[in-house]
Design a protein with these regions (language model features):
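Beta-strand scaffold of nucleotide-dependent catalytic cores
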Residues: 166, 280, 348-352, 421, ...
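Conserved non-cysteine loop/helix-boundary elements of the Radical SAM core domain that shape
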Residues: 181-380
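Amphipathic, soluble alpha/beta structural segments
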Residues: 214-215, 219-223, 233, 401-407, ...
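Canonical Radical SAM [4Fe-4S] cluster-binding loop centered on the CxxxCxxC motif
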Residues: 159-195
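N-terminal [4Fe-4S]-dependent radical SAM core
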Residues: 88-95, 115-163
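Short beta-strand motif preference
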Residues: 50-52, 165, 279-281
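Radical SAM enzyme core and accessory elements
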Residues: 1-108, 112-116, 120, 413-489
Length: 489
C-alpha cells in the first residue's frame, strides 16, 4: 500500500490520517501504476477526491472545495484529510479510537481550549463530532485534564524549570527501541569521560539558571539506562546534582532504574542516599519468552528481586512500565503482566502501546505480530488498574503507534509524576544535560519558546563539549531578552 497526495502544498495531515489505517505505508511522489495498491488523495480545481485501491478492488469519494477560511471554512488540507479518513473508515471497517486526531497531546488540547474560554459543550463537540474521537478515550482525557489542573499551577509558575539528565548507555538494545544509546560492553571506555562532561554541564546549567533567576521544580535522570553507570559513577553524578541544587525545594526527583540486569542493591542505596524521591523499574512484560524475544537479558524473577531490593533500600515511590503489543505477547500474557505489576503494589504503573519506530529491530526485521490483532483488547485490561485504586494522570500519543492508541500513566492518589505532566503539557522550561538533550525554554506564559540542542551521539558530545557549554549560555540570553511579565529585574 502506497500513499499519493497531490494538489496541496503539504499533505502532512492526509499522510498521517492514512497511516491510522496503514501504519507503515510509504509516501510516494509519483502516481501509482495501474492496479497498484494505494490511497490517492487529490485537491482538484473543482473539488476534493480520494480513492483507495487494494487487492484489485477500488472505492472513491468526492467533496466540494471548502469555503474560504475568512468565511469559516476548513483548510483544504483538513477537508481532504477528513474525506480520506471517512473513505478509509468505511473501506477497512476500522474506527480509530482517537478518530482523526493525529496530535500527541490530546490532554493539552483540552487545557488550551479551556484557557481560550471554550465551553465544555463546545469542547465535547470538537472531540466527538469534528474529530470522531470515541467517547471512552475523550472521557479519559477529560478526567486527566481535571486531575492535572492543580499540578500545572505549580509547574507553570513564572520562571520555574525542570532538569533532565540523559544517560545514553544500555546493557543491550531492546528490539522496539530506536533511541540513540550505546552498548555498555562495547562502549564502556566512553562512560567515564561522558560522566565527567555531564557533571560539568550540570554545573553550567546551575550557573545559567541562577543568572536567569530560574527556580528548579523537578529532576529526571533518564536514558538509556541510568543504572548502567557504576555505583561510583552514580555517586559522582548525583553528588554533583546535590552540590549544585537545593533538593529540599524540588517537588520530585526521579531516577530510571529501569533494568534489573544492571541495577543492584548498592546502586539502589546510592540513588536513595543522594536524594531521589522516585524511581522507575520497568519490566515491560513479566513473560520470560517475550523478554527474550525483545532482547532483554534478564528474567521476570530478576524484576521481582530488583523490586524487593528497591523496597528494602527505602524507595517508597516506584513506577513500573509495561508495553502492550510486544511481539509474542498475547492478551492473556499481557493480563498476567498487569496483574503481576498490580500485586507488587507500586505507586505508579505506566502502560505504553508499542510504537513502530523505523530504526527499531521490530520494524527492520518485520516482527509486527500485533498490528491490529489484540492490542486494543490488551488496553481494555487496564480496567484492572482502576479496580485496584489507580487513576490515569497523564497521557500522550506517538506516530505509528499500534491502532493509533495511547500511553497512559496510572498512579495511586497523591503519587502523580510531576515531571511527566510538565513535559507533556509544555508549561515550563526543561533544561537538558547529556547527549541528545533538547533544552526547551518557555517564557511569557508559553507564548515564547526556544530550543537548544546538544549533540546527538555520546562520542560527539564528548569531543565537542566546549560547544555544548557555549550553547548553554543561550539560557540566560533567552531570559535577558524576555520583555514579558516574567522579565528579571
Amino acid at each position: 500500500m502506497k500513499i499519493y497526495i497531490t494538489g496541496l502544498p503539504s499533505g502532512y495531515e492526509v499522510e498521517h490520517l492514512v497511516r491510522l489505517f496503514y501504519p507503515m505505508a510509504p509516501l510516494t511522489l509519483t502516481p501509482p501504476e495501474a492496479g497498484e495498491d494505494c490511497v490517492w488523495a487529490e485537491k482538484k480545481p473543482d473539488g476534493l477526491w480520494a480513492m483507495v485501491r487494494q487487492g484489485g478492488k477500488c472505492a472513491e469519494r468526492t467533496a466540494p472545495l471548502p469555503a474560504p477560511a475568512e468565511a469559516g471554512g476548513e483548510t483544504p488540507e483538513f477537508s481532504l484529510a477528513s474525506l480520506t479518513y471517512d473513505l478509509l473508515r468505511q473501506w477497512t471497517g476500522i474506527r480509530p479510537p482517537w478518530g482523526k486526531m493525529t496530535g500527541e497531546r490530546p490532554v493539552r488540547l483540552i487545557h488550551d481550549k479551556r484557557a481560550a474560554g471554550w465551553s465544555e459543550t463546545d469542547i465535547d463537540h470538537f472531540f466527538l463530532e469534528r474529530f470522531d474521537c470515541s467517547e471512552q478515550k475523550y472521557q479519559m482525557a477529560k478526567a486527566i485534564a481535571d486531575l492535572q489542573e492543580p499540578i500545572l499551577k505549580v509547574g507553570s509558575a513564572p520562571k520555574t524549570y525542570s532538569l533532565y539528565i540523559g544517560i545514553p548507555f544500555c546493557p543491550s538494545r531492546c528490539s522496539y527501541c530506536s533511541f540513540v544509546s550505546c552498548n555498555l560492553d562495547r562502549d564502556r571506555k566512553m562512560v567515564q569521560p561522558y560522566v565527567d562532561c555531564l557533571c560539568n554541564e550540570v554545573e553550567e546549567i546551575r550557573r545559567q539558571a541562577d543568572k536567569a533567576g530560574l527556580t528548579l521544580c523537578s529532576i529526571y535522570i533518564g536514558g538509556g539506562t541510568p543504572t548502567s553507570l557504576s555505583a561510583d559513577q552514580l555517586r559522582q553524578l548525583m553528588g554533583t546534582v546535590r552540590q549544585n541544587f537545593d533538593l529540599s525545594k524540588v517537588v520530585e526527583y526521579t531516577v530510571e532504574a529501569g533494568r534489573p540486569d544492571c541495577t543492584d542493591a548498592e546502586k539502589l542505596a546510592v540513588i536513595k542516599e543522594y536524594g531521589a524521591t522516585r524511581i522507575s523499574i520497568n519490566p515491560q512484560t513479566f513473560s520470560d519468552e517475550v523478554l527474550a524475544g525483545i532482547g532483554r537479558k534478564h528474567s521476570a524473577q530478576d524484576i521481582l528481586d530488583c523490586y524487593a531490593e528497591a523496597r528494602k533500600a527505602g524507595h517508597d515511590d516506584i513506577n513500573m512500565d509495561l508495553i502492550a503489543g510486544l511481539p509474542g505477547d498475547t492478551v492473556e500474557s499481557f493480563e498476567h503482566s498487569l496483574r503481576q505489576a498490580i500485586a507488587l503494589d507500586p505507586e505508579n504503573i505506566t502502560v505504553h502501546t508499542l510504537t513502530l519506530k523505523r530504526a527499531s529491530r521490530i520494524v527492520i526485521e518485520d516482527q509486527r505480530e500485533n498490528d491490529y490483532a489484540d492490542v486494543a483488547a490488551m488496553l481494555e485490561k487496564c480496567r484492572l488498574l482502576a479496580e485496584a485504586g489507580y487513576r490515569p494522570y497523564y497521557l500522550y500519543r506517538q506516530k505509528n503507534t499500534l491502532q493509533n492508541l495511547e500511553n497512559v500513566g496510572w498512579c495511586k492518589p497523591g503519587h502523580e509524576g510531576y515531571y511527566n505532566i510538565y513535559i507533556m503539557e509544555e508549561v515550563q522550561t526543561i533544561l537538558s544535560a547529556g547527549a541528545g538533550g533538547s533544552t526547551k525554554l518557555v517564557a511569557d506564559g508559553g507564548r515564547r519558546m526556544q530550543r537548544i540542542f546538544n549533540f546527538k551521539y555520546p562520542n560527539e558530545y564528548i569531543q565537542r563539549f566546549a560547544e555544548v557549554l557555549e550553547r548553554k549560555k543561550g539560557v540566560a540570553d533567552f531570559y535577558d531578552h524576555d520583555l514579558g511579565p516574567e522579565a528579571s529585574g
